[in-house]
Amino acid sequence: MHRYRSHTCGALSTAQVGEIVRLSGWCHRIRDHGGVLFIDLRDHYGLTQVVVDPDSAAFKDAEKVRAEWVIRIDGKVRLRPEGTENPDLATGAVEVYATELEVLGPSAELPLPVFGDVEYPEETRLRYRFLDLRREKLHRNIMTRGAIIDAMRSRMKGQGFFEFQTPILTASSPEGARDFLVPSRLHPGKFYALPQAPQQYKQLIMMSGFDRYFQIAPCFRDEDPRADRLPGEFYQLDLEMSFVEQEDIFAAVEPVITGVFEQFAEGKPVTQKWPRIPYAESLRKYGTDKPDLRNPLVMQNVSEHFRGSGFKVFARMLEVEKNEVWAIPAPGGGSRAFCDRMNSWAQSEGQPGLGYIMWRDLSADAAAGGEKAVKDALEKSRGPGAGEGHVVEPGVVGAGPLANNIGPERTEAIRAQLDLKAGDAAFFVAGDPDKFVKFAGLARTRVGEELNLVDKDRFELAWIVDFPFYEYSEEEKKVDFSHNPFSMPQGGLDALNTQDPLSIKAFQYDIACNGYEIASGGIRNHRPEAMVKAFEIAGYDAQTVEERFGGMYRAFQYGAPPHGGMAAGVDRIVMLLCGVTNLREISLFPMNQQALDLLMGAPAEAAPKQLRELHIRPAPQAK
């Protein structure tokens, strides 16, 4: 028999009844029932119940065992007594009567329990991550992650892609975040950079004559962490294709991502035909370029209903040409309590408030409060915008300060445009859309969640297309790239030479899923003269382009094929499919929010000898 096991702890069934077996694993839990010890023995594959009674030679050793001790047991497989079976356990029909027990590795007192789902502080969990990873849910997440990556590889190969590995030590490049720098011992004063993405290398692969590349690529960015972004490093499904247009990329990628989601969605519906949503439309309808399409709410421009109205705040705003008023419909949100709650939320977000209109059914009010209630409601609904002698018939009317100020005709026009009914409400944001769009998107999300309008049991995928190539940087007071500087501008060199830079769109696209950006890519700018012009508009001269992107720029001079690609965030996809909201729940050994590895003690001071070899002298710290 093998030194440690003949079977795993998830393998035994009624087929092995009567056999002598050997198992090794962790003591998941130990219970004493009337002097008989029951040990739940756990390994990577499952859990088996082990029984040790006082007649067993193993009993004396078993009495010493505590939670998370590693033990080996020999024993005989038998059926569990009738009525004690556990149908939720793969081995739940049998148990092992132990005849021999060996302690392979005792455990100190546990700083956090492995059994159960008790929440513990993140610092404790990360410092003792090896214990945390033994917990069932996290252990399962990590296994799911590996299976998802396997599925990605298999599906990419099925689409004709070939896997390559690009260098980890490379040159610094402006990918939008700070680099992690690695000092060179052999070249004093010079540094390598860890790749923020394999962007230049994958384009060089296309210029080297290969046709379809992919890899599960580690990426390193020195940026501030957040829940959906791990500090330090992350992984992406990186790909590139030659001789393609945008739709060719979509046709290759869509079945891979859809297939992976269907395989691991546990029966939840997955979008079959992905919509293509232009960037500007996504902002206008959803307030974000990564919309959660499970939320049915669509924002609309209702400026005309407030222009010249009795609500002077909005009316004066609309005298400025660029300003608009947007409405966020709230079906079923027509209660004062809900509207006040949303108003308080808006103030907590740093806004002065959130204007609203509620719609009520006057006929229902009449039944409840009589004729006087109807007259009072009618009088209030007339408002300053109604005009003398205006008569409102009983029916659905607007209520609230905005409705009182703009009058029933405008209020009814808003209701009709938004397709709302009695018991519904709408919230309003006004001003420069460029400045309020982010808040409007947050408000749409908040309304959808508060009113339980979001179907949590499905995955909605969409392409976001037609991103602006440039944006104006208020901080630097200049035009800069809005996304990937290597993307092809729509209209090519001619657009760069003749159009207002802020009007140029790029062959740039993202994949949005349930409110997250899970992939981004573009058709590449493969003509050197167009590349130089694109960077010139953003403030980089030709010499800078040659210095910073020398390898790729040189390759462009020797016959570069039209090409494009994208990168999908492995971590975010796994996070969504595992049903968690924090990336640390799907990563083996993550850092904390301060970018500290509490388990390994990184970052740490380097030894003086190491620093001397690298020709580095730490600067004195300011006091």
From Swiss-Prot:
It catalyses: tRNA(Asx) + L-aspartate + ATP = L-aspartyl-tRNA(Asx) + AMP + diphosphate. Keywords: Aminoacyl-tRNA synthetase, ATP-binding, Cytoplasm, Ligase, Nucleotide-binding, Protein biosynthesis. It is an enzyme of class 6 (ligase). One of its GO terms (molecular function) is ATP binding. It comes from the Bacteria. CDD domains: EcAspRS_like_N. Residues 199-202 are annotated as: Aspartate. L-aspartate binds at residues 175, 221, 483, 524. Its main location: cytoplasm. The keyword Cell inner membrane does not apply. Aspartyl-tRNA synthetase with relaxed tRNA specificity since it is able to aspartylate not only its cognate tRNA(Asp) but also tRNA(Asn). Reaction proceeds in two steps: L-aspartate is first activated by ATP to form Asp-AMP and then transferred to the acceptor end of tRNA(Asp/Asn). Belongs to the class-II aminoacyl-tRNA synthetase family. Type 1 subfamily. This is Aspartate--tRNA(Asp/Asn) ligase.
